[in-house]
Every structure is written in C-alpha cells, then in structure tokens.
C-alpha cells in the first residue's frame, strides 16, 4: 500500500457497535470499504466520494483524533451521504390488465420491459397485476388496486445493489428481495402506519385507509418492522406476521395461518357440470382468498376473490389448465 495514505477513517472493528446503535429499520449511515494495495485517500475521494469532500462527516463517523497510516485489508467506514450516486431503474416483468396502465408524464401505457425510474407512482386498477424487476434481481409484485411510489431508486459508487425506498399508499405489495444484497444497502418500504427495513427476504405488506390498518407478513428471512409511532423495530421472521393499528402501533406478532386443504369436489347437474370444491376449514381463519390463473406461477391473466366459507366454485372444466392458490386470512387481516 502507498505509505502516503492518511488514516481518515477508523478500522471497521467498530462497525458492529456503530451499526447496532441505530434502529435497524432506519437507513444505515455508513458503507464499509476494504483498503487495497495502492489506495490513497486522494484516489478514494476522487473515485468514490462527492466533491468537495465532507471531511467533517468523515471525522465524525470515524471518531478521528490523529492522522495515521492505514494497513491494507482494513475496513473503512464511509458516511453514505458523501458517496457518489447515480440513477438506477426497474423494468416491468409481468403485466395483466384489460385496460392500459399509465404513470404520470408517460406518453405510452405500461408494457413488458417498460423502464421505471425513481419518483414513479404506479396505481394498479382492480383485477390487474403488475410485477417489477430491479437491477439486482429483486422483484416487486403489485396486486389488484395497489398504489406504490418508487421514492428512492439509485446506486452508489461502492455498492452493486441499488438503494430502494418504497411508499405503499393503498392495497398490498409482495416483495422478493435478492439475498445477495449487502446488509448495509437500504431497502425500505413505508406505509402511513408502518416502516419496514429489509435484509434479503420475501414478504408482503398491506395498508387500507378505509380500515385504517396495516399488515406485514414474512415468508422468508427477517424483516425489521415498526409502526410509525413505535420507537423501536422488532424482527419478524419466516412464518410470522404483525398487524399495525390505526395509531401506527405494531400489535402482537402472530403465526401466519396455513392454507385450507382440498377435501373433495361435488359436480353440479348438467351436460357440462361445474364443481364445488370442499376445503378443510382453518379454525382461526376469518375468511379465505383464492387466486387463479392459467400459469403455475400465477402470472398473466389472474383473478382474485374472497371466500367466506371453505368452499370453492369451479366453473365448467375446459382443456385450458387453471391453477389455484388458496390462503387463509386471520381476524387481524394477516394473510397466511
């Protein structure tokens, strides 16, 4: 390493203490960088940092008192807000809607491959579904009647995955966050009632202004969740969920309910009979949701409706295969 490199950071042995002192649902304030042979501060600043360099921020983040030499392999804490940034983007991965969907200032309706950038607001009409693919492979799925703003979608010079902040203003959103993202790269989703910080996971978020309630349901990984008026986030793990009340308070964590199982089918009378499928009732279910499509992954044309009883009406059978997904919904609104 070039011996002219001054220590303008502290070795990252303090990173764990520093990071844990913040609410993990908040934005991580530093990025870790490992010093390489030939690095000098001037080279690092020119390549990675916004100019002019905010020396006060560097000194504050690293608790510097003296300039010293920094060995190769040491990890540096660089304040996130001084790192160079560039725009990232998402693209429409799948789309199912009988009517055109437009975003503000767009000359054309959404289509497969349409590029979505920071600031876009996507409002999904009833009976429609939209999926977005981020540059790092993360997927955002918007079901019927959802409204989502892409508040932040940008990359910085030190991390490969984009920083993501989403605001859900209506309905539900399903997220499959790429597991290869760095733990310090922000991926956050907010509703008027809750804030979720993500570290590589699959989960769902719901919000209804009519019911004045929200939900967080984790299918894999860990989601740091807090209500908008809570002071501390709680980790929600796979198979668990938490309802959020109208005051922005996260309520008791619940086990997500299992789906109802297929029990039997009874044919109706007629030359082309329909069927009534009997489902095994789930004791704590308030109602059930059935999604159906012509593809096994439920992309393309997709319909969704609620079942108040554990019975599913299946129209006459055709040569076209239909796939069904059944879920149970608890009294607090958590979807299993």
Spans of model-derived segments:
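Conserved aromatic anchor
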Residues: 273-285
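Primarily a LysM-type cell-wall glycan-binding module
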Residues: 21-49
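Short beta-strand segments within Ig-like beta-sandwich modules, predominantly Fibronectin type-III
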Residues: 302-308
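Extracellular LysM carbohydrate-binding repeats and other cell-envelope/extracellular binding modules
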Residues: 22-27, 50-87
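Flexible, surface-exposed loop/linker segments and immediately adjacent secondary-structure boundaries
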Residues: 37, 71-265, 270-273
